[in-house]
Amino acid sequence: MTEEPTKENLGGPKSPTPVTMEKSPKSEVVVTTVPLVSEVQLTAATGGAELSCYRCIIPFAVVVFITGIVVTAVAYSFNSHGSVISILGLVLLSSGLFLLASSALCWKVRQRNKKVKRRESQTALVVNQRSLFA
């Protein structure tokens, strides 16, 4: 077997052990290493989009909620209480409501954190302004 050098990511943490091993038809073992990604690299790559999860969940939650309403309405229009389709409709309906509620909760927490940061920065500005004029 011949060993080929692997290309490593600069600045990224190195994977201590190979992650995936595949066998080719010629009885050769191909080792694929997957680099670990840090939170800083993720933020740099996504532009901070991982902190806006509540914005991504809203459209998905609305679609799931509407689907749940439709499936539940169809199931109960045929008087099939307790059937698989009615249970599926209720699960979709409750999942949509849960996703909408969690999105609203995340939005409220984020707004509260923004207010706190804004208040802290205003306090720091006022303190700096007083020290300049004192």
From Swiss-Prot:
GO terms for biological process: angiogenesis; arterial endothelial cell differentiation; BMP signaling pathway; cellular response to BMP stimulus; endocardial cushion development; epithelial to mesenchymal transition involved in endocardial cushion formation; in utero embryonic development; Notch signaling pathway. Interacts (via C-terminus) with TRPA1 and TRPV1. Interacts with TASOR. One of its GO terms (cellular component) is endoplasmic reticulum. This is Transmembrane protein 100. Pfam families: TMEM100. Keywords: Cell membrane, Cytoplasm, Developmental protein, Differentiation, Endoplasmic reticulum, Membrane, Phosphoprotein, Transmembrane, Transmembrane helix. Plays a role during embryonic arterial endothelium differentiation and vascular morphogenesis through the ACVRL1 receptor-dependent signaling pathway upon stimulation by bone morphogenetic proteins, such as GDF2/BMP9 and BMP10. Involved in the regulation of nociception, acting as a modulator of the interaction between TRPA1 and TRPV1, two molecular sensors and mediators of pain signals in dorsal root ganglia (DRG) neurons. It comes from the Eukaryota. Its main location: membrane.
